[in-house]
Design a protein with these regions (language model features):
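Glycine-rich, aromatic-flanked loop segments that form ligand/cofactor-binding clefts
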Residues: 95-117, 121, 125, 285-298, ...
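Short Pro-Gly-centered flexible turn/kink motifs
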Residues: 269-287, 692-702
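Active-site-adjacent "subsite" loops/lids of carbohydrate-active enzymes
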Residues: 307, 323, 363-368, 376-435, ...
Length: 703
């Protein structure tokens, strides 16, 4: 807990001065990767293997045994990439054992290595945004391997590590180059395998029942399933048992202590002569705590480092338009209130799949008008959960029928003729109209396809991989062309900007009173691993799916108190909601309320976009609240506090200021009142007393 910690030497509060470096050991036998927060050591002869993986913050050693660097199946045969043999005791490694280990002739052998400065994975133009972003810095090391087997004569494998500055993070991926004159088939490719120290022991227990190693968090850019959470969307992390670890406590050798990373359904991808196959990219983040908030802060720090585009957070309206005049009116309203962007929502009259000259010209003109007012403009398109045709939809491998096993009931195949044309049409529409934002509903959800006639994939065995690559290629293109992407699935590491915070859609048909509390619960629950800018919420200005007048805000001027509070809840959390309807205001008094709220948000934007500390979840019985913290800003913290009760309340709470970076005294003010001085106790807390009117809220600034 923070009680024993000193926030002045905590890398999450004060950045470390050490930079990523790669160096050889004195005896030239080892290559060491280190950045002050983690250290990873490789023995490079007689073959290459990782012998040491250590968290420098708490001294934890993660490895109990050595394993090959990677595994690859080529033309049906499996090969190890690197690897040494001879370890008998697999519960720990003694450094002197490593000198006696031997290589196997049939493995890919280590040839050479290169070290470079880290280059960004996607070349997005940063710093067009009010919040400071930067491309990641660090070192990139490539270990090159080849095989002595005649059949693999011209096949080269490279294992890549990217070590980041200032965060205990290493990214690992593998590339395969086919320098031969014939096609090869790449089957299962395991890009990472680690014999990890077990998290716990049990004499009897299954891998499912036993905890997995907590000192490492893994995230790979191959995730989908509509959960709005990475851990449930993950498709590549496999916690396996290790039968050669004979000294483990578990009687049946069932301890989950062998980690392998690979996409399960990718078993046969053709690699043409001269081409390079690149594996998934696995982010390995070392954890020094069980504390949920701290673990979440580390993950949020990772997104800011590796996917800085997730920090962009334009203030947008979700317009449901029937004609061009409504678009022009909405652009004018955005401009008048300080909004920054307009998205033509689902159900509006913008069809991004209509590539006719007439449609392009119409939207180009509207985009030009938006840009003349300083407003970004975007459109909506649905990929999955729609039916196109028997020829173009995903074919179920079991029944051979279209759509029979689609995740959303129906789905086109991204590799079908229609799917390939869909991608080209979207790019052309965005390029020709000058649209700035793309809202992609139903992004590719992982459906396999058994068709052998689709031009974009060969058969079932490469269908998921090829569709994934096509979906990612669209997001890479958007990212590198500065197009902002909202997509409700986990494609952040491949260039998307925002995902749904995690809500039940029909709740927006409930009375506004329920929506207020449920929205605060969604914010609290949705921001453990995500930063505020990575999520969108929802505010139905007009009827959405169901509900009567008690559920909607129109006429806006008659519901100003609720409209303002719903805005303050989201903007106060740093979360952009989809304000869905035909207009942002109906009267001058409504316009003033919207403008004042946006002006407040822009004034405190830096702290409101900072990570949140969870204070108390909304339960409708007592106060609830969250607090943003930013140790690097002038404003160190900002609290949003709510009273859902029908009477005024006064409460005294302990405010945890550890992650604000404050050490001695905090200056705290309610809204724009005079600040009072508070001395922090040994646990970096202050006692704060506040009063909130019935069914209302307040906010405090900490400096």
């Amino acid at each position: 807990s923070s009680n024993e910690k000193n926030n002045e030497i905590d890398w999450l509060v004060n950045p470390v001065s050490e930079k990523a470096m790669v160096y050889k050991s004195a005896d030239n036998n080892d290559i060491i990767l280190s950045n002050g927060l983690l250290k990873r050591t490789f023995r490079i002869q007689p073959n290459l293997v990782c012998t040491d993986f250590k968290n420098m913050s708490n001294g934890q050693q993660l490895l109990r045994a050595i394993k090959p660097e990677a595994e690859i199946t080529i033309d049906g045969n499996s090969y190890n990439i690197g690897g040494l043999y001879g370890q008998i005791e697999n519960g720990y490694i003694r450094p002197e054992w490593v000198n006696k280990f031997v290589a196997h002739d049939s493995d890919f052998h280590f040839l050479s290595y290169e070290v470079n400065d880290l280059k960004p994975f996607l070349d997005r133009k940063l710093n067009i945004w009010p919040m400071k972003q930067q491309h990641p810095t660090g070192k990139d090391i490539a270990f090159n391997f080849s095989s002595s087997l005649a059949t693999l004569d011209s096949i080269f494998v490279t294992v890549h590590y990217e070590l980041h500055d200032g965060i205990p993070l290493i990214v690992k991926w593998v590339s395969v180059k086919n320098n031969s004159t014939h096609v090869i088939t790449v089957g299962k490719l395991v890009n990472e395998q680690l014999a990890l120290v077990e998290e716990e022991s049990a004499v009897v227990g299954t891998p499912e029942q036993m905890k997995k190693q907590h000192g490492i968090y893994l995230e790979t850019n191959y995730a989908f399933n509509n959960a709005m959470r990475y851990d449930i969307s993950d498709q590549t992390t496999h916690w396996l048992t290790d039968s050669v670890y004979t000294s483990q406590v578990n009687y049946n050798y069932q301890t989950p202590c062998l980690l392998k990373v690979y996409p399960e359904k990718v078993t046969g991808v053709e690699l043409q002569p001269g081409d390079i196959f690149k594996s998934v990219r696995t982010h390995e983040l070392l954890m020094d705590s069980y504390d949920r908030e701290r673990r979440g802060l580390v993950i949020r720090k990772m997104y800011r480092a590796v996917a800085p585009w997730t920090m962009e957070n334009p203030i947008f309206m979700h317009l449901v338009s029937r004609n061009d005049d409504e678009v022009i009116n909405a652009i004018n309203q955005c401009s008048a209130t300080g909004y920054e962007a307009l998205i033509l929502s689902f159900g509006s009259h913008c069809n991004m799949e209509d590539s006719s000259a007439e449609n392009i010209a119409k939207w180009r003109k509207l985009a030009d008008y938006a840009h003349s007012k300083g407003i970004l403009i975007g459109g909506y398109s649905l990929f999955s959960s729609r039916r196109i045709s028997d020829e173009d939809d995903v074919i179920d491998p079991i029944t051979g029928k279209p759509d029979a096993a689609a995740f959303f009931g129906n789905a086109p195949c991204m590799g079908s003729k229609w799917g390939l044309a869909y991608l080209a049409t979207l790019k052309a529409f965005i390029s020709k109209t000058g649209f700035d934002i793309f809202e992609n509903d139903g992004p590719y959800p992982g459906d396999v396809c058994a068709s052998t006639k689709h031009p974009g994939h060969k058969d079932l065995y490469d269908s998921q991989w090829k569709q994934m690559e096509l979906q990612k290629s669209l997001y890479h293109w958007c990212n590198e062309h500065g197009v902002y992407v909202n997509a409700p699935d986990w494609y952040f590491l491949d260039g998307t900007n925002k995902i749904a915070i995690g809500y039940r859609e029909v709740n927006f048909s409930l009375p506004r009173e329920n929506q207020k509390i449920l929205n605060r619960q969604n914010i609290y629950d949705g921001l453990w691993e995500k930063t505020p800018s990575m999520s969108w919420g929802f505010v139905p200005l007009t009827r959405y799916q169901g509900g009567g007048p008690e559920a909607v805000l129109e006429p806006l001027s008659e519901h100003l108190k609720d409209y303002k509070q719903l805005m303050m809840q989201y903007y106060g959390a740093g979360v952009q909601a989809c304000y869905r309807g035909p207009r942002l205001y109906d009267t001058d008094s409504t316009r003033k309320v919207v403008s004042e709220t946006i002006a407040w948000y822009k004034k405190y934007r830096e702290i409101l976009n900072a990570d949140i500390i969870h204070l108390r979840r909304a339960d409708g019985r007592d106060w609830d609240g969250i607090m943003h913290v930013n140790p690097h800003g002038k404003t160190k913290a900002l609290l949003m506090l709510y009273n859902p009760l029908k009477e005024k309340i006064t409460r005294t709470i302990k405010l945890p200021l550890y992650y604000s970076g404050i050490t001695g005294t905090a200056l705290i003010r309610e809204q724009e009142a005079a600040a009072k001085s508070y001395k922090l106790n040994r646990g970096y807390e202050v006692e704060l007393t506040f009063t909130i009117a019935a069914e209302s809220y307040t906010w405090f600034v900490v400096e």
